Design a protein with these regions (language model features):
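Extended, charged alpha/beta regions that create polyanion-binding interfaces
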Residues: 1-36, 41, 48, 63, ...
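SF2 DExD/H RNA helicase N-terminal ATP-binding lobe
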Residues: 35, 78-81, 287
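A generic structural signal for short beta-strands and their flanking turns/coil linkers
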Residues: 41-43, 68, 84, 332, ...
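Structural signature of multi-pass, alpha-helical inner-membrane proteins
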Residues: 43-44, 49, 55-58
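Conserved glycine-centered short motifs in functionally critical loops
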Residues: 55-59, 94-104, 108-116, 243-424
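OB-fold (S1/OB) nucleic-acid-binding surfaces
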Residues: 59-71
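Alpha-helical multi-pass transmembrane bundles of energy-transducing inner-membrane proteins
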Residues: 69-82, 297
Length: 425
């Protein structure tokens, strides 16, 4: 069965689930009310403070209703001064009390390459160079033409593409970077977003380009596969493995810790370690685990450690954030670092009034397709959102229904992240 991308559309609030052989491996969603720009957005930032000793810059970005803090690590060269305006790309969402992260210039990337609007020519990533890969002559020629304008970094994914496909992607990305860089240079709209980053559906299709895309307008596929239960399970600290073994996943601020437990299985330490590898890689993508990660595999001999290290590197090779595997410590713990980009899944799914209100709208949409009238019962917090900040969402969904659906606030209504109560008339 091919990888499937299931899109549950709602104006400004699409949900996107990615399934591999029936397993949920990634989840994304849009938030049309978010003030902060999405990763991949191009913006102009205003320099506030410069920390030359650690090459960090504190910036401000103009957004609807004010401005937000942002952080930029300076890649080298003469540092800017407070008050300077810079073209930047949003690299990561805010997390753990830290502001959103920026990258200097316009940056566009795919699994095979990174283009930046700074001239450094063509280079291979360390992992790609280790394979003995040689860049096609046509791509080298393109890099020479662009030298001084932008740089190209080829990634491990480049080795999977033929020369013509690689060149076509490079030309497309170079044109995109050039257009965004020109827009940023010409912008007179202040220190804000010039171009928004990819939405949830585009992000999923970018990461899984060969996946089958299913537009689930009625929500039937979402219900049939019980995706809400899968998503709920994805924020549990326990992940069940085949044969009764268990992964314990803890993600406190600072570093994530993943521990394997044989549970009710009869797996040997070596077999348990092998059974952990792919689920660990999938859990990091699905749960959006980033930063330092410590994995407590069962005690292994040196040969088994080498085998598990190679398996981990293979398992994360296609991760869009390209984790760096450090290997086993002398104490037997396995460590890696996964770059930041998105908020952790548990934080994304926190049951806020907005999330509860959106769940009620999805239920109203499903109920409205099979009944002349209906009442969706929601807790007061969700009702207040639907009648306030969420009124535009509510009106957009309701005008697409042939039936009449009303929302009733009830103190006794118990609502999860995903469900409300419905009574059909």
């Amino acid at each position: 069965m091919p990888i499937q991308i299931i899109i549950d559309p709602l104006p400004g609030a699409d949900r996107v689930a990615v399934l591999n052989d029936g397993r949920l491996i990634a989840y994304f969603e849009d938030d049309g009310t978010a003030a902060a720009p999405r990763p991949g957005s191009i913006a102009r930032a205003r320099v506030e403070r410069v920390f030359a000793e650690n090459k960090m810059i504190a910036c401000r970005l103009d957004v609807a209703g004010g401005s937000i803090a942002a952080s930029l690590r300076w890649p080298g060269g003469a540092m800017p001064k407070p008050g300077d305006r810079l073209a930047v790309t949003v690299a990561a969402e805010a997390r753990e009390g830290k502001p959103i992260q920026l990258r200097r210039g316009v940056v566009r990337e795919d699994p095979a390459m990174i283009f930046e609007s700074r001239g450094r020519g063509l280079r291979l990533s360390r992992r790609l160079a280790a394979t003995g890969f040689e860049a096609p002559a046509a791509l080298v020629d393109l890099a020479l033409k662009l030298k001084g304008e932008m740089s190209i970094t080829l990634r491990l994914g480049a080795a999977k593409l033929d020369a013509d496909t690689l060149l076509a992607r490079a030309v497309g990305l170079s044109e995109e970077v050039k257009a965004h860089a020109e827009s940023a240079a010409a912008s007179t709209s202040g220190d804000g977003v010039i171009s928004t980053g990819p939405d949830a559906a585009s992000t999923a299709q970018h990461i899984f380009p060969a996946a089958e895309v299913i537009m689930d307008t009625a929500g039937s596929r979402w219900q049939e596969t019980d995706l809400d239960s899968m998503i709920e399970a994805a924020i549990s600290p326990r992940c069940q493995l085949a044969g009764g073994a268990v992964l314990h996943i803890n993600t406190p601020p600072g570093a994530a810790v993943i521990d394997g437990d044989s549970g009710n299985s009869n797996l040997s330490p070596s077999a348990l370690a092998g059974a952990m590898v792919v689920p660990v890689a999938e859990a990091m993508l699905l749960r959006r685990i980033s930063g330092p990660v410590v994995i407590d595999f069962p005690r292994l001999d040196r040969t088994a450690m080498q085998r598990i290290d190679a398996a981990m590197r293979d398992a994360v090779a296609d991760d869009p954030l390209h984790p760096v595997c450090h290997g086993f410590t002398p104490g037997g713990l396995y460590t890696l670092t996964r770059p930041w980009r998105w908020r952790p899944l548990a934080e994304l799914l926190a049951p806020t009034p907005q999330r509860l209100g959106l769940a009620a709208l999805r239920l109203a949409r499903r109920a409205g397709m099979g009944a002349k009238t209906g009442i969706v019962v929601v807790p007061p917090a969700a009702g207040n959102w639907l009648n306030g900040d969420g009124a535009a969402y509510r009106d957009e969904v309701m005008k697409g229904l042939a039936s009449r659906i009303e929302f009733l606030s009830d103190e006794g209504c118990v609502q999860t992240r995903f469900d409300a109560q419905v009574m059909k008339g």
